[in-house]
């Protein structure tokens, strides 16, 4: 454990609670001290749903520390079993309560005897995995549990559906634009004549998980949650899966072609015919998605000399890197992810589309990288938005973690062909504010002429005199911060603590 100012991926119990609260009629018991029980407030604020978050905190207090937790945890499980009548209760500790090293499996076994609900302990190592890994593992554990239960009851039907069908795995609460992406993916599959068999975990019942083997293939739109489940279903039941994220015109077409391949492997036998989705891909690419036209427009051509930095989860950061470089011609100076457990896949995806790759979960390292590169725009998480504000660099938010403004009520998918339009808008609008600020200054649109001094870490103690500040204010705002940082570095390098007009012009000559 470590004390941090900012975490890209939360602790493991948050991932378990995301999966539990995504299912319908599933309740989670969180064995935790006060301070770890913020999930309810966070989810209620961000998702803005009508229903209460189905999570109860079993608080570890001084009485628990003296007597032990067993009675309190078991009482909480049985009480929720009677009050809520859930199909499943998931017990999870937090990284803090795990220090107690209690036998929680024994608590679960005891509660299972007197509860009508199924009760399981989240099989997660809270010291070694983060939120995303825990969510992936918990979803696989729940699926494995109910398919095993159906097998023991001899109620597991493995016959596939009469028409092509798919399971969508990984849509969950608190995901980045997950609800919008699901609507777009649902429309995409319907256009292809594919029935949706199950969507897990969001909005599904655990009792319906025994129907998962009926699908022709599994669709995993995000690597972070769902991949372990898809691998398990392929190994255990022979169900193939598609894990190409349909973001951008090229990868959406690639995803559809993979779907076509898996459909045709079964269609030859089940339907005695094959499917051809190429006309659909052509129609959508040329006439529905505006991204291809936009990439050839003068607006997008003007962005080709610009530099960008991209940072986020592995799925969104890799997809955005390929879209900006391959489809829009924008130079990606650095592409990075905080998913250190998936660094090999991320490197493989982006190494041909960017100048350098950054794998870190330290926001200060990301900030210093952005300050060094001085890109025209950043595409990242909520933290990169803060970094951009400090450096006066525009930022488009393209990945979790995000704040409430990136849980829009309107329809804004990032996946599918409609998602390509949303991404094109986001990219273009992120590059524009620099010129807008310049024109506002040029025509005197603001009341103040003060120069905002912004730097990250290295130029502390450097003072600008009023005359040099006035001269700096004459530089267009979209270039001002970059030039100021270079002058600051020049002053520090040459041992100056106060910048005047003479030093300023000497630095500009050396630029």
UniProtKB/Swiss-Prot annotation:
Pfam families according to UniProt? Oxidored_nitro (PF00148), PCP_red (PF08369)
Where is the major localization of this protein? plastid
List the catalytic residues.
299 (proton donor)
Q: How is the cofactor bound here?
A: Binds 1 [4Fe-4S] cluster per heterodimer. The cluster is bound at the heterodimer interface by residues from both subunits.
One GO cellular component term, please give it: chloroplast
Where substrate binds, per the record, is at: 434-435
> Localized where?
Plastid, Chloroplast
Molecular function (GO) terms listed? 4 iron, 4 sulfur cluster binding; ATP binding; metal ion binding; oxidoreductase activity, acting on iron-sulfur proteins as donors; oxidoreductase activity, acting on the CH-CH group of donors, iron-sulfur protein as acceptor
Report the enzyme's class at the first EC level: oxidoreductase
Cofactor section: [4Fe-4S] cluster
Annotated binding of [4Fe-4S] cluster, by residue = 36
The family database entries (SUPFAM superfamilies) matched by this protein are listed as:
Helical backbone' metal receptor (SSF53807)
The pathway entry for this protein reads as:
Porphyrin-containing compound metabolism; chlorophyll biosynthesis (light-independent)
* Stored Gene3D superfamilies: 1.20.89.20, Nitrogenase molybdenum iron protein domain, Proto-chlorophyllide reductase 57 kD subunit B
Q: Which UniProt keywords apply?
A: 4Fe-4S, ATP-binding, Chlorophyll biosynthesis, Chloroplast, Iron, Iron-sulfur, Metal-binding, Nucleotide-binding, Oxidoreductase, Photosynthesis, Plastid
Q: How does it assemble?
A: Protochlorophyllide reductase is composed of three subunits; ChlL, ChlN and ChlB. Forms a heterotetramer of two ChlB and two ChlN subunits.
What protein family is recorded?
Answer: Belongs to the ChlB/BchB/BchZ family.
**Protein name listed in UniProt:** Light-independent protochlorophyllide reductase subunit B
Give the originating organism: Huperzia lucidula
Name the gene.
chlB
